[in-house]
């Protein structure tokens, strides 16, 4: 992945695009010069072609689309994705298969790859592209890839194997009424954040932070992203892959995890943080929950849970030590639509991917999900609920998250390094120092075993 180029593009798309109180996404193209010279009419023309550029075929086809995001699935149902595409391509039927979460999705893909039965459409995470590269069809020729700001930045050996759907930031979602009840202000530092949790907890009426720790993944804003934020290094996993003992006390990972441990020691997740999954606790945001840490993808769930949406506020996770420090926040490019190279419906799949990025459908979907556009010159206004975080921190530094290169993945597999599971263990009371000591030993051994 071309990290430097990606960071330059994201800076243009996020930092520059906070205009007149709204974050306008997709306002930068490949370079500033190109952005200046590309007219809106050209963009509309390009996007209008998005569902038409794949090799046309009138042969009947049924394509299977595996979806793991509940929020995406809800949006597809509301927008009638299958029916909308059927109007454009009457000969192609789309069948959506919903799986529980990203973990189940990845496991299912591994099993089906071995059986040569991958689904036609797969919304992969960035790191999965390398894992499945030998099974994926190049998408360089489709219009969706050509109008995408970041598709080529994630190309492998010159091949675009997945077209990214969106980019998004991470937030702490909170109930304004609860903050008002306890006379609380939005925290600006990590210690202030923990203090807010303690105040709410002491009141005895609400759970300070909803977690759903029975599922491992919901702790990702803390256990996965905070080391990158502490280091101001979105490629921290790659950096760590070049170090024998990256878990020592003077390293960013340990420093970040010490902060996380301080939060977990405050026990802000209720009496049994590992006793319920995310789907169980997310509905409590409308009643017993004061805060929840999640990405922009949580917007639909937040609106479902809270009757009065004006009561929903957002702020960036305040990982900094003092108010004078610059705040770092994670930016993720996500949802890489891919199709198997040995699939029976490659052309139909390409037409469907193009449709997903067609102007009318894509614009509506981005608004519905509260996500940021990655289509060149297509501006989608951010939802006002999310805009609150940007207004409160206009100088926030966007840290572009990289899921890790092949060397990191090799070491990760050898050491069974799993940050989300570590989060569960920390909540359960496992010693941080012992975890770090053990990881240093296994990490060093894994690096030496090349």
Where are these regions (language model features)?
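Conserved N-terminal structural module of periplasmic/extracytoplasmic solute-binding proteins
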Residues: 28-128, 186, 307, 321-324, ...
């Amino acid at each position: 992945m071309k990290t430097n180029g990606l960071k330059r593009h994201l800076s243009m798309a996020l930092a520059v695009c906070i205009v007149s109180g709204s974050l306008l996404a997709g306002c930068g193209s490949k370079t500033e010069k190109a952005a200046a010279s590309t007219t809106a009419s050209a963009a509309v023309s390009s996007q209008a072609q998005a569902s038409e550029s794949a090799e046309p075929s009138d042969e009947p086809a049924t394509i299977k689309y595996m979806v793991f995001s509940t929020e995406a699935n809800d949006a597809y149902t509301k927008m009638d994705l299958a029916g909308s595409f059927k109007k454009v391509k009457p000969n192609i039927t789309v069948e959506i298969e919903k799986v529980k979460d990203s973990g189940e999705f990845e496991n299912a893909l591994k099993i089906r790859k071995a059986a040569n039965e991958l689904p036609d459409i797969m919304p992969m995470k960035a790191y999965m592209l390398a894992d499945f590269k030998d099974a994926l069809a190049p998408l360089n020729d489709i219009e969706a890839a050509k109008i995408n700001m970041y598709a080529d930045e994630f190309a492998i050996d010159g091949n675009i194997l997945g077209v990214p759907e969106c980019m998004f930031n991470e937030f702490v979602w909170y109930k304004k009424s609860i903050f008002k009840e306890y006379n609380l202000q939005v925290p600006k530092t990590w210690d202030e954040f923990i203090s807010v949790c303690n105040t709410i907890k002491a009141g005895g009426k609400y759970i300070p932070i909803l977690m759903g720790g029975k599922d491992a993944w919901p702790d990702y804003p803390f256990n996965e992203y905070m080391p990158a934020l502490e280091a101001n290094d979105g490629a921290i996993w790659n950096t760590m892959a070049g170090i024998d003992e990256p878990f020592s006390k003077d390293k960013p990972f340990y420093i970040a995890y010490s902060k996380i441990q301080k939060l977990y020691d405050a026990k802000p997740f209720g009496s049994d943080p590992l006793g319920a999954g995310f789907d169980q606790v997310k509905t409590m945001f409308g009643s017993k929950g004061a805060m929840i840490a999640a990405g922009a993808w949580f917007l639909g769930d937040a609106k479902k849970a809270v009757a009065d949406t004006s009561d929903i506020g957002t702020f960036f996770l305040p990982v900094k030590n003092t108010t004078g420090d610059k705040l770092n926040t994670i930016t993720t490019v996500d949802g890489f639509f891919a199709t198997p190279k040995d699939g029976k419906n490659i052309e139909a799949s390409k037409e469907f991917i193009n449709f997903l990025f067609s102007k009318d459908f894509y614009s509506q979907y981005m608004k519905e999900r509260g996500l940021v556009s990655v289509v060149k010159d297509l501006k989608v206004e951010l939802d006002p609920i999310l805009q609150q975080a940007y207004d409160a921190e206009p100088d926030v530094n966007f840290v572009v998250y990289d899921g890790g290169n092949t060397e990191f993945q090799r070491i990760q597999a050898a050491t069974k390094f799993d940050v989300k599971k570590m989060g569960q263990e920390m909540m359960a009371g496992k010693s941080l120092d012992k975890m770090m000591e053990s990881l240093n030993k296994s990490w060093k051994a894994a690096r030496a075993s090349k």
